[in-house]
């Protein structure tokens, strides 16, 4: 009589120890630096980092406007969290929403003049904090290596943003 032993399923392949160590360091660095930036921005400007980030991303976009889906891909919030945040910012006049002309289900977030002024008032202090907690800690070579590695991660993981038909390709004359 043959004895059949049940073999355990093989462990799925996982990250190498180096990858796990890098991942943990990335998470910890992200947490401690963003908490420090948040604390200082709220203390000096009464502006949470997520709100600053939305205002900044809009200010960097053409015409100060982005599709909500595009904005969600650029900030530290879920799409539902971004919707609630944009509603709050709209309520205090820092952004406004516009319907996408070619897709009524889609919307743009647009930076207002008041929003641009609010961002400008917060920017100098925030940039000093970024320099203190980030720029002063790494040398130029470390900064460039980190930028290249992070850009590679973004490119490998960023989903293609949704857009209005007019965002996808410019109209042909």
Task: Name the predicted role of every residue range.
Residues 1-17, 140-173:
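C-terminal regulatory/oligomerization modules of transcriptional regulators
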Residues 1-45, 92, 172-173:
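N-terminal leader segment of winged-helix/HTH proteins
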Residues 2-4, 8-10, 87-145:
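Charged, amphipathic alpha-helical coiled-coil/dimerization segments
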Residues 24, 53-57, 83-85:
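Base-recognition residues in the alpha-helical recognition helix of bacterial helix-turn-helix
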Residues 27, 56-60, 123:
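Short, locally clustered residues in the helix-turn-helix/winged-helix DNA-binding domain
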Residues 33, 37, 75, 118, ...:
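Alpha-helical linker/hinge and terminal dimerization helices associated
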Residues 35-78, 164-167:
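N-terminal helix-turn-helix DNA-binding core of bacterial DNA-binding proteins
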Residues 68-69, 80, 87, 107:
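Residues within helix-turn-helix
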């Amino acid at each position: 009589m043959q004895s059949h032993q049940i073999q355990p399923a093989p462990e799925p392949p996982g990250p190498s120890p180096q990858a796990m160590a890098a991942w943990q360091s990335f998470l910890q660095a992200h947490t401690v630096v963003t908490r420090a930036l948040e604390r200082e921005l709220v203390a000096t400007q009464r502006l949470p980092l997520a709100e600053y980030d939305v205002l900044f991303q809009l200010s960097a976009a053409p015409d100060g406007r982005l599709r909500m889906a595009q904005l969600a891909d650029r900030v530290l919030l879920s799409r539902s969290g971004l919707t609630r945040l944009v509603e709050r910012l709209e309520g205090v006049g820092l952004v406004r929403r516009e319907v996408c002309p070619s897709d009524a289900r889609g919307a743009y977030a647009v930076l207002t003049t008041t929003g641009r002024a609010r961002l400008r008032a917060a920017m100098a202090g925030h940039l000093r904090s970024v320099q203190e907690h980030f720029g002063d800690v790494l040398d130029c070579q470390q900064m460039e290596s980190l930028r290249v590695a992070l850009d590679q991660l973004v490119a490998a993981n960023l989903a293609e943003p949704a857009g209005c038909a007019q965002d996808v390709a410019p109209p042909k004359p």
